[in-house]
Amino acid sequence: MRSLALYEEAFRGAFRTFYGEPSHWSLYALLPNYLRRKGSSLVYMADRLIKECGSGGFYLDDYDALLRDMAADPKPKILLGVSYALWDLAERYAPKLRDTVVMETGGMKGYREEIPKEEFHRILCDAFGVEAIHSEYGMAELTSQAYSQGGNRFRCPGWMRVVCRDVNDPFELLPDGSRGGLNIIDLANWWSCAFIQTQDVGRVDDDGSFVIEGRIDHAEIRGCNLLVQ
């Protein structure tokens, strides 16, 4: 990426689109393994947003400190965690979180059993005492992010769009409501390719929102945190 300023403008704009001003929130980031290597775009984004929030911080695997600090924080909070770390927190502590949006990202990456997203979110909701699990969808190849505020239904900022393709014919785009591979158009990829073909499978509806249902069979496991292995 030639300009980090463009990346910052994109992720700030996407965050404000769905959550308003960062200063309204405290952001707590539970991102083990992402923090153990340099160059993670997710860590960079979280770090800048934490600074704009003015409160919160990174927690590698110190769950006691995380829960203690969140309990003492009077502001509305976002707990941004990689999926397998949130599951660990739910199993070990099952804390009832007050004034908190729980936001998962990153998937299991081979660290935990893959289960249906609805079942996983139900486990987290029951453990944390929240009504819905939010999600952030992004990847190293994208400058922008999509967000789900519950129900695994993602929405994009205005400069990003998702379309559905036939998994057996990459040149055939499918009509709204069809299930297939997801292609992403990200106009913030100014100095790189703005058209990304992913190995995620899902459905795009006529309002532009999309649902992720899994990965194409035999697709590679993705995630920059895996580089620490």
What name fits each language-model region?
Residues S23-S26, G39, D47-Q229:
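Active-site glycine/GP-rich loop and adjacent strand/helix microenvironment
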